[in-house]
């Protein structure tokens, strides 16, 4: 029997990415306290949260594969979250200007039959152009990236902020490492092709 697929996320970006592989899935809101633990590294944080999200859906029935994902952005060795305000978005982009920032994306696939989770972390680097405050403000006013870690949307005008991108899968930057997910699903017996 083929496993049913659940995305433990309410993110429209993750739903859109997952729909690219043309498998039927349902999206469920995970129950997860996303507060970092004291002295927790970015990698440990995102893998812990991805696995917690995948395990938090309360599905006891066998034959489900539940996908959990979490992402943080690190600027100058400091974890930054979603800015939520214009002022904070401008501040984050000023800190990123001319620097490399790193996104860590945790991905977990929980198998409800075996009660086992396969969890990884994928890294993606973004090299920012040297930006003026005016360029940053123009970008923030046009795209309003208040609910995006790092204060940009790479799938939109945010691409103009970058000098180069470095990573295995560009989907990782948006929040769901699709190439790795396909490998993980196939390992669980769910073939995409």
Swiss-Prot record:
It is an enzyme of class 3 (hydrolase). CDD domains: Maf (cd00555). GO terms for biological process: nucleotide metabolic process. The active site is at 70 (proton acceptor). Its EC number is 3.6.1.-. InterPro entries: ITPase-like_fam (IPR029001), Maf-like (IPR003697). Its cofactor is a divalent metal cation. Keywords: Cytoplasm, Hydrolase, Nucleotide metabolism. Signal peptide: none annotated. It is found in: Cytoplasm. The record marks 13, 71, 155 as: Important for substrate specificity. GO terms for molecular function: nucleoside triphosphate diphosphatase activity. One of its GO terms (cellular component) is cytoplasm. It catalyses: N(7)-methyl-GTP + H2O = N(7)-methyl-GMP + diphosphate + H(+). Belongs to the Maf family. YceF subfamily. Nucleoside triphosphate pyrophosphatase that hydrolyzes 7-methyl-GTP (m(7)GTP). May have a dual role in cell division arrest and in preventing the incorporation of modified nucleotides into cellular nucleic acids. This is 7-methyl-GTP pyrophosphatase. It comes from Aliivibrio fischeri (strain ATCC 700601 / ES114) (Vibrio fischeri).
């Amino acid at each position: 029997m083929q496993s049913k697929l659940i995305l433990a996320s309410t993110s429209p970006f993750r739903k859109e990415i997952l729909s690219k592989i043309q498998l039927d899935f349902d999206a469920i809101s995970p129950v997860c306290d996303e507060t970092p633990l004291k002295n927790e590294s970015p990698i440990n944080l995102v893998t812990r949260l991805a696995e917690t999200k995948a395990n938090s859906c309360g599905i006891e029935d066998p034959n489900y594969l539940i996908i959990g994902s979490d992402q943080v952005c690190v600027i100058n060795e400091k974890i930054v979250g979603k800015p939520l305000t214009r002022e904070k978005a401008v501040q984050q982009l000023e800190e990123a200007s001319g620097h490399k920032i790193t996104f860590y994306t945790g991905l977990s696939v929980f198998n409800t039959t075996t009660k086992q989770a396969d969890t990884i972390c994928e890294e993606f680097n973004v090299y920012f152009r040297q930006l003026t405050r005016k360029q940053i403000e123009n970008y923030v006013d046009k795209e309003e990236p208040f609910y995006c870690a790092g204060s940009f949307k790479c799938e939109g005008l945010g691409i103009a902020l970058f000098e180069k991108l470095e990573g295995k899968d560009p989907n990782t930057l948006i929040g769901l490492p699709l190439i790795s997910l396909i490998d993980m699903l196939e390992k669980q017996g769910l073939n995409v092709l």
